[in-house]
């Protein structure tokens, strides 16, 4: 029992330090349905996103016509295996990192009426990189 309390305390400390690190880097951590995610990654925040990418196993990268530019408004939806939306948010830039639990997830992105989606299995310590390349207007 005592060992469990020590482990729980260390985990709480780690989570607090992780959030503090992101805040110190100027990244706001969002949370929906118990899932943490960060948005943006353009301009000055790109370097900060690279520093915390290991904490988020799902990396959504948004391009337009194959170019890494500010994509403008992009709506991201993360759906569970039942098809229920667990996260719905604006990308806020070319990167959208998500920390869902293991399972089958569908990530959808919508920009100017164009919809893209990808379903993947997230297991163990695996990282998923999901590239969404939208058409140029």
Walk through the language-model features, giving the residues of each:
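A short tyrosine-centered beta-strand micro-motif
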Residues: 103-109
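Short, surface-exposed beta-strand/beta-hairpin micro-motifs centered on an aromatic residue
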Residues: 93-99
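Short beta-strand segments within Ig-like beta-sandwich modules, predominantly Fibronectin type-III
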Residues: 86-91, 120-122
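Short amphipathic beta-strand segments in non-cytosolic proteins
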Residues: 75-86
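Bacterial N-terminal signal peptides that target proteins for export
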Residues: 1-6
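N-terminal signal peptide c-region/cleavage motif recognized by signal peptidases
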Residues: 13-17
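Primarily secretory-pathway and cell-envelope proteins
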Residues: 20-74, 112-137
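Surface-exposed loops/turns
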Residues: 101-102, 124
């Amino acid at each position: 029992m005592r060992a469990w309390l020590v482990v729980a305390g260390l985990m709480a400390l780690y989570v607090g330090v992780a959030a503090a690190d992101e805040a110190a880097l100027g990244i706001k951590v969002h949370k929906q349905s118990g899932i943490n995610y960060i948005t943006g990654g353009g301009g000055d925040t790109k370097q900060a996103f690279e520093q915390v990418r290991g904490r988020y196993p799902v990396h959504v990268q948004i391009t337009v016509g194959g170019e890494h530019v500010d994509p403008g408004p992009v709506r991201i939806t993360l759906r569970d295996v039942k098809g229920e939306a667990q996260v719905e948010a604006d990308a806020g830039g070319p990167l959208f990192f998500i920390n869902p639990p293991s399972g089958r997830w569908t990530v959808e992105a919508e920009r100017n009426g164009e919809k893209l989606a990808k379903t993947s299995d997230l297991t163990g310590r695996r990282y998923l990189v999901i590239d969404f390349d939208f058409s140029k207007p």
